[in-house]
Amino acid sequence: AKKIGTTINEPLFGKKLSSVKVTSNRLAGACFYVVSGHGGPDPGAIGWVGKHELHEDEYAYDIALRLARNLMQEGAEVHIIIQDAKDGIRDDAYLSNSKRETCMGDPIPLNQVQRLQQRCNKINALYQKDRKNYTYCRAIFIHVDSRSKGKQTDVFFYHSNKKAESKRLSLIHISEP
C-alpha cells in the first residue's frame, strides 16, 4: 500500500499536475483500470458549440485523468489504459482534438471490434498480475455522449451475472434531487 504523504509521478497528468500526493489510504488494496471512451482514430460523438467542434474522446480522456488522479490520492493503484503523452489534464473551455491517443503505448486500431479487444487484452493481462496483490480490482469505462433529447443523460451499468452485489448495484435507480 502507498503510504500517506508519498508522492507519485504520473506524466500523463501534464507538467503542472504530474506530481500526485497520496492523502488517504481509503482505497489501499484497490486497483482500477481507467479507460476513456474512443480515442485514436475514433473521436466518438462530435458536436458543436458556436464555432468550436467538440469531440467526445477529448472530454472523456480529461475526465478519466481527473478520476485516475483522485483515485491515486486516495491510495489506489491505477492503470490508465488510453493514453495521450501530450494532452494531460486541461482546464480549457474547449478541448482541441487529436489522434495521438494510444492503448498503453500501442496504436489504437480503426476497427471497432479490434479496438475493444485491444483494451480487454490490456486489462486482462494487467489483472492477471494485479489480482494477486489487490483485494479489489475494477475497470471503469468513461463515455460522455448522450442520445436522450429530453434529459440529455444516459447511464449504463454492466454487471457480472456471477455476483449478486454487482447485479444489485446495477439495478439501483438514480433519481434527480
What are these regions (language model features)?
Residues 1-177:
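Catalytic-site microenvironment of enzymes
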